[in-house]
Amino acid sequence: MSRYRGPRFKKIRRLGALPGLTSKRPRSGSDPKNQLRSGKRSQYRIRLEEKQKLRFHYGLTERQLLKYVHIAGKAKGSTGQVLLQLLEMRLDNILFRLGMASTIPGARQLVNHRHILVNGRIVDIPSYRCKPRDIITTKDKQRSKALIQNYIASSPHEELPNHLTIDPFQYKGLVNQIIDSKWIGLKINELLVVEY
């Protein structure tokens, strides 16, 4: 299955707020179809919705998500927690968390168009796994800096997770450590995703 490119608002109405997909919020009580659907939810539906939340928030394909679940299963510790840590340490997600992009698809585009350097080298793979002490900067070109400057200026200044630091004047971010589970911005039960 390929990456989802359809209407984002439909997914938000169905699954709830997905800050990585879009910053828009649905109005409460505005969708009459949703009110008709509010029957008893089966266990399968609950697990499926949790998995879809994760997929659409991080912009993953089904195959990519399965690969991450497989890697998390082999690692030490809780599979669900390790899965979320793996997803949070992706380069596109870290750019989103730093405020250098308004959404994760926007961050993915910045990386694909070669505007981002990690430790002084161009990285054009959005799924690149960042490690502690990685320095994320933009290219020295004026166009790259202008893009990042627009994103930083237009984004609401939310509290930065403690595993990241940003210098907005030098367009530079630093990964301090692996993310702590309380800083994950998505309300999700990761165990249901692993069970699915």
UniProtKB/Swiss-Prot annotation:
Where it mainly occurs, coarsely classed, is: plastid
PROSITE patterns attached to this UniProt entry: RIBOSOMAL_S4, S4
Give GO BP annotations, semicolon-separated: ribosomal small subunit biogenesis; translation
Disordered: annotated segments: 15-42
Example GO CC term: the record gives:
small ribosomal subunit
Q: What is this protein called?
A: Small ribosomal subunit protein uS4c
What keyword terms does UniProt attach to this protein?
Answer: Chloroplast, Plastid, Ribonucleoprotein, Ribosomal protein, RNA-binding, rRNA-binding
Which molecular function GO terms apply here?
rRNA binding; structural constituent of ribosome
Give the subcellular location. Plastid, Chloroplast
- The gene name on file is rps4
User: What does the function comment of this entry state?
Assistant: One of the primary rRNA binding proteins, it binds directly to 16S rRNA where it nucleates assembly of the body of the 30S subunit. With S5 and S12 plays an important role in translational accuracy.
UniProt lists the family membership as follows: Belongs to the universal ribosomal protein uS4 family.
The signal peptide, as residue positions, is none
Q: Does the keyword RNA-binding apply?
A: yes
Domain (S4 RNA-binding): give its ranges: 89-150
Q: Cross-referenced Pfam families, in alphabetical order?
A: Ribosomal_S4, S4
Summarize subunit and interaction data from the UniProt record for this chain. Part of the 30S ribosomal subunit. Contacts protein S5. The interaction surface between S4 and S5 is involved in control of translational fidelity.
